[in-house]
UniProtKB/Swiss-Prot annotation:
Function: Required for the maintenance of the bipolar budding pattern. Involved in selecting bud sites at both the distal and proximal poles of daughter cells as well as near previously used division sites on mother cells. The RAX1-RAX2 complex performs the asymmetric localization of the two cortical landmarks, BUD8 and BUD9, at the distal and proximal poles, respectively.
Glycosylation sites per record: 41, 45, 69, 88, 124, 134, 145, 158, 166, 171, 187, 200, 235, 238, 244, 333, 365, 379, 432, 445, 516, 524, 613, 620, 626, 640, 677, 705, 713, 721, 731, 749, 758, 792, 821, 848, 861, 884, 890, 908, 923, 942, 956, 980, 983, 1011, 1024, 1031, 1060, 1071, 1098, 1126
Transmembrane segments: 1163-1183
Assembly and oligomerization: Forms an heterodimeric complex with RAX1. Interacts with BUD8 at the proximal or distal pole in unbudded cells. Interacts with BUD9 at the birth scar in budded mother cells.
Subcellular location: Cell membrane; Bud neck; Bud tip
Signal sequence region: 1-20
Superkingdom: Eukaryota
Post-translational events: Glycosylated.
Encoding gene (name): RAX2
The protein's name in its UniProt record: Bud site selection protein RAX2
Amino acid sequence: MFVHRLWTLAFPFLVEISKASQLENIKSLLDIEDNVLPNLNISQNNSNAVQILGGVDALSFYEYTGQQNFTKEIGPETSSHGLVYYSNNTYIQLEDASDDTRIDKITPFGVDSFILSGSGTINNISVGNQILYNLSTLSMTPIFNQSLGAVQAVLADNSSIYFGGNFSYNNGSMTGYSALIWDSISNTTQLLPFGGFGENSSVNSIVKLNNDNILFAGQFYTLDDPSALISSSNNGTNSTSSLNATTLELGQRIPLRYASWDSQGSTTFASDSLVCPNTNEDAWLYPDTSGSLVCNLPYEVSPTKIRLYNSQRSDSEISVFQILTDPSSSIMNLTYLDPLSGELKNCGEFCPLYSRATLLSASQNVSSSMDMITFIDNNKTDVKWTSDFQDFAFVNELPVSSLKFVALNSYGGSVGLSGLELYQDTFSTYANDSLNEYGCSALTNDSSSSTLSSNDWYNGLTGESYIAAKYVPDQNEPIPRVKFYPNIIHPGHYTINMYTPGCLQDNTCSARGIVNVTMWNQQNNTIMKTYLIYQNNDNLKYDQIYSGYLDFSPEIVLEYVSGIYTTNTATVVVADQVNVITVSLDAFNTLSDSSNAKKETLLNGILQYQKSNFTSTRLNETKVGNTTLNLFPVKNYPKNSSLYADIYDNKLVIGGVSNRISIVDLNDDFEVTSSKNQTIQGDVHGITKTNQGLLIFGDILSSNNQSAVFLFNGSFENVFNQSRTVNSALNISLANNDFIVLDNDYVVNASSNALIRNSSSFSLSLWAAGNNGDGDVLFSGAVSHMQYGNLNGSVRFLNENEIEPLNLEGGIVPYLGAYLNESATAYAYEVDSLNKIYFSNEVYPSWNWSSGITQMLYADNQTLLAVSAGSSTTAELSIFDLRNLTMIANETLGSNARINALVNFEKNCSMLVGGDFQMTEPNCTGLCLYNYESKTWSTFLNNTIFGEITQLSFTNSSELIISGLFETKEYQSIRLGSFNLTNSTMIPLLSGSEGKLNSFTVTEDSIVAWNDTSLFIYRNQEWNITSLPGNASSISSVSAIYTDIESNTLNKRGINNVNNGSILLLNGNFNISQYGYLQSLLFDFQKWTPYFISETTNTSNYNPIIFINRDVSTEFNSQSPLANVNITVTSPQSTSSQPPSSSASSESKSKSKKKKIGRGFVVLIGLALALGTVSVLGIAGVILAYVFKDPEGDYKPIKPRIDENEMLDTVPPEKLMKFV
C-alpha cells in the first residue's frame, strides 16, 4: 500500500518543483510563513528512540501557516466549492464559495492567470461572466458583462480566448450562438467572423491545430452566417441535381380553402381555382387597369412570402401591385429575385410583376436553375421565379388576419390573376383537420393531417384554430386523443413545437388538465420523445417537443392524462396545432445543375476554422471549405451528432455516438490521410487531456457491461470499470502523484489505475482544475493531504521531519512501550478486547489483561517487568520474571483504584506503587509498598505521604521526586516534591490548591512539570508558569529532546549540562487559531513551534503518545535499600538561622550564591540529575533550593506573551518570580 510521503509512487514526468512561479508571491500576499523546525538531533543512529504509539494512521509535519486547513478528512460538512492553490507540496485556500457556486472549468492563461467558468458567485462576482483570476495580485475580473450560461470549452490562443458551449451573445448587430472571442489586450468581446453555430447548437471542444487553424467540435450543422459555407466551383462539367431548384419549397403553403374573399366589382372570381392555380385559365379578372382583391383568413398566420401567377391573357396582365395587411393596416415591404438582372431587390408601394412572355424569355436565357432561386433569412425562405410565377418575400414577418392585393397598373386594359398562394416558413398541422386541407386534389399527398378520438370535440373561440373536449373519467367515454401527422417531404433538420391555447380567453383555467405528448417513429414504431404538458397556461404557449434530424413523417399523439385540480370532475382538453420549423435541408447538398453552381459546405459537429480565410481580400475566397476534416464526420457519423475532439501526437481523436471512437491521422496541412475506428459500446460524453494521454469517458460499457473510461496514448487502455455513466473526468497532479477524478466521486491513480478511496491520509473533492505548466495548480474543491499515510498505528522518527511505520510483526498496534535493552522493547497492545505484551525480539508471552495497561517498569538487574493495568473501576499489578516468562506476583487493588506510577527497590524486592486509590489493610492512600517476594503490602513511611500520586522518579538511588496532589504532616497541597530516602525528609517544590500536576520531566538544567493546560518550569533559580497557546488545548505528555549533536543523548541524559541544550516535545491536543488543531508542539523555553498534526486509526481505543525508547532504568529503579519504611516523614532543617524576610533578600542571596556555585548546582536537584553519582551532592542541591524558598512553597505565575496569535519569544527576567 501507499505509505511513505502518502505514496511511494513517483512518476518521471512529475518533477518536484523547487520554487513555483507564484508560490512565494502568494505567500507574501497572504502573510503565510514557513515553519522552520529546530534541529532535534533525531536520527537512525540513536536506535530510532523517538516513536509514536497508540494508533496513529496519518501524520504531517507542520511546514507553513494554513497547512491545517488541508489535514482533516473531507466530510459532508466540508466546503468544497472555493478555490485552492497548490505548488511544491503547499496548499493555500485562495477563495471560499457557497455550495450553490459551481466552477466547471479552470483554464490557464499566461504566466500568472487562470480563467474560471461555471455558475454562482465568488466574492459577489458572477462565475457565469467568466472570471480572470490573477495570481500575481490575487485579483478577480469579470470578462463579460453578461453570464454566458453553459461554457464547455475554453481555448487560450495567445491574447485571444475562445469560449464554446451552449449560449448566445448579441454584439448589437448580430446574435451569435455557442462561440465567442475575448481579446485580452483590448479587453473587447467579438463574435467569430461567421457569428456562431446557429440556434440549438453547442460547442463541446476547441482545439488549436496551429497558429492559423482552430478546430471546433460539438453539435451543429450550420453557421450563424451561412454564406460562409457557400463556395463557387467552376470545374467545366455539368452535374445533375438530385432535386431541382424549381421544385424545392422551404416553406409550407397556407391552406386557403376556408378563407373568405371580397372580390367586389370583379367580372370573374373562382376561389378554388385561385388557390389551386391552373396555368391555362384566370381565376380573378377585374375590368379596369387597377383593382383589388381581399382575402380574410380563417385564422391568424405569419406568412413569409406570396406567390403570384399573372393573368393568362396579355391584355389583363398586371404590371405593378402592392400588398396591404391587417391588423397592421400597412403596405408590406417585399423582397424578390429580379428575373432580368438576377439581383435580389426590394419594393413596397410599387412592386413589379412581369408578364408571362418576359418570364418565359428570362427562363430560357439562364445558365442554371440556380439562377432562378435565392435563399434569405438564414436559408429559411426561398425566393424564386419561373415562367409561370414570381415569389415576393415579406421583409417583416407579421401576424396577418386579412390580406389585400391591389393591382395598380396593367400591361393592357384590365387586371387579373390565375393564382395566388401564401407560404409560411413553418409546417402547421392542426387538430381540426379541415384546416389542413388545401382544397386542391393535386396537393392531397403533400398535406398534413390529423385524426381525433370519438369524443365530443367542439371548436374553440371564433377566429381561433383550436378545438376542445370535456372529459369525465370512468364514464365509459374514450380517452381524448389527437394524432398529428405532419408531412415531412424533404430530409433535414427540424424543430417541432406543440401549441396550447390560453385558458383566460375561454375561461377554462380551473378545468384544464395534463396531457401527454409522444412523438413516434412510424418506420420502426418506436418512441422518439415524450412529454407531460400542463394546459392551464393563461395565454397561448408552445412547448418544443423535438429538435433534430428527420427523413420521415412522424406521428405525434396528444392524449389526456389527468386533471390538475381535484375539485373538478370534468376536464377540458384542448388541441391546437403542431408546428414544424425547417432548420436545414439535405437538398442543399445537391442543389447544382451547372458548372457554375454554388455549393454549400456541409457540417456535422466539426469545423476547421482557418483564420486567414476570413482576413483575405481576394474575391470569391472560400471561407469554410469542404476540407477533408470538415467532411469526415459528415461521411462517418449520423447527422446532428454531438462530437468531442482533441489532439494526441498529431492524431485527432473524435468521439460521439454510433459506438465508435475515430483516430484520424493528419498531415501538415491538416488533411485526413487515414483513419481507423475503435469500436465501443455506447456514447462518448467527453475527452480530457491528461499527462498520460487523452481520457475518453461517457456512457461506455466494457466487455463485462460495466461503465468504462479509456485512456488513449497511441493505444487504448481501460482505466476504470464501475456500474455507472461517467459525465466528468479531470486530471490533477498533487504530491508527486497524478490523479484522475471521475464525477467528483472516484479518484484513480493514473499510473497504477488503482482506485483511491478517501481516508485520513488523503481525500479529494474536485470540480475543476487547471495547471499552467510552471508549477501553479489552481482547483475548485477540497483536499486533505497528510505527508505520511497508512502508518499502521505506530511510527519511528528517522530525523526531526521524517518518519516511517514501526511495522511490528503481525500488524500489532502498540499503545505503550518500555525499553528493555538495545535489542528488545516491550510493547502493550490490544487484540480481541484483550490487552497483551509483545517483545520486539518476536516473543509473544501468553499474559493478557481485560483492562488497558497503564504502566510498564523494567528492572534490568533482575530481568523483572512490572505491569499495571486498569479501568475506571479497578487496577491490577503484575510482576514477571523475563528469564523464563513466569509470573512472580499478581495483585488487584480495590474498586475505583488507578495505578499511575511505579518505582522499584531492588534490594528490598519491593515496588512502590503510586496512584489514586485507598487501601485499608495496610492503610495506604495513593502510595503503598508491595513486596513481590513475600507478596505483601505495607505502608510507605507510615502513610505519612498520602493523596493522589501521578508520577514517581529517582534522581539518584536515594532521591525520589513525586508529583500529583498530596500531603505530609507538615505540608498540604503538595503538587511536586523531592523526598530523600536516606533521612526521610520531604522538600515541597510546588504547592498550591490549583489542582494536581500530571507528571514531570527533568532536563540538564530544568525541571518541567505540567497539568492539562500549563507548564511549570524551574530554571535559572526560579519557577514560572507557561500556559499553552490557544484555547481548549491540553497536554498528554512532555518529553525532553536533547539537542547536543556531539553525543547520542537520546539514549541517556547528557553529562555536560553547560553545553547541552534541550527542547520540550509536547504531545496532546492543541487548538491554536493561527495553526489550527495540532497534536504536537515544541518549546525551547522561549518560543513555541508547531510540530505535527496526526490522525488516529478508526480501530484504536487509545490516543497517540510519544515514546522515547531509551534506557530509563535508573529513573525507576533504586539500588539503595530501604532502611526503615515505617518512620515518619520530616521536613529538612534550614541551614539559615532566620527565614528569608522578603523576595528582595532572597534574590540577593541567590545572586551571591550564584557567584560561588556553578549553574548546574543551582538548578533544583540538578547536580544529582546531571551527574547521577554522589547522593550527598544531590541532597545539597535540594537543601540549597529549599533554603531559598517560601515556607508554603507557593509560586506566582507570570503572564507570558502568548495568545492565539503569537508564540512566546522570551520571558523578561524582571517578570519572573523567584523560587524563594
